């Protein structure tokens, strides 16, 4: 089970990185097309329809798919100034409280995002723009990212309880 979860977190991180590459590709292609228009005039004026919409969808996908991977690698911002003064038991309690609160909030967001996803699919909602995309498609990555984050929080709660100490390390301390 541990290997499966780690592979899921990595896959989510790789998907997020892939969406960042897509943002770079779409925006770079549009910049090149703008340069061609500038150099050769409006006779060679080309544009990628809805490129800003696509870049926005890719950004939302990358952001939410990266959450679980970043959390499990200790990359999220953590306030250690206060908790480093705690003893072992209060620090463990603070860690479990924050992980549990994160899991509850993430589960809440996941539930309602999936409901929104289903409604968007059912109503046939489309994005605004030159190319109308069924909005449930980009919402799917957000739902998946939130679901992965919820799983990661529950996983970290379990690992913390089993270890009897906080298991997350800050990336800046490595």
Describe every region a protein language model picked out.
Residues 1-174:
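Alpha-helical transmembrane segments and membrane-interface helix-loop junctions
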């Amino acid at each position: 089970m541990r290997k499966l979860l780690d592979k899921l977190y990595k896959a989510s991180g790789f998907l997020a990185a892939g969406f960042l590459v897509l943002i770079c590709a779409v925006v770079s292609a549009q910049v090149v097309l703008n340069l061609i228009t500038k150099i050769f005039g409006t006779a060679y004026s080309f544009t990628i329809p809805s490129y800003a919409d696509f870049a926005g969808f890719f950004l939302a996908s990358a952001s939410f798919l990266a959450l679980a991977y970043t959390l499990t690698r200790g990359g999220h911002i953590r306030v250690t100034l206060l908790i480093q003064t705690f003893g072992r038991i209060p620090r463990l309690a603070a860690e479990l409280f924050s992980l549990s609160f994160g899991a509850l909030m993430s589960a809440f967001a996941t539930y309602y995002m999936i409901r929104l996803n289903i409604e968007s699919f059912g109503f046939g909602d489309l994005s605004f723009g030159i190319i109308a995309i069924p909005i449930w498609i980009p919402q799917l990555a957000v739902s998946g990212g939130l679901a992965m984050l919820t799983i990661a929080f529950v996983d970290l709660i379990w690992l913390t309880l089993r270890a009897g100490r906080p298991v997350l390390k800050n990336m800046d301390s490595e």
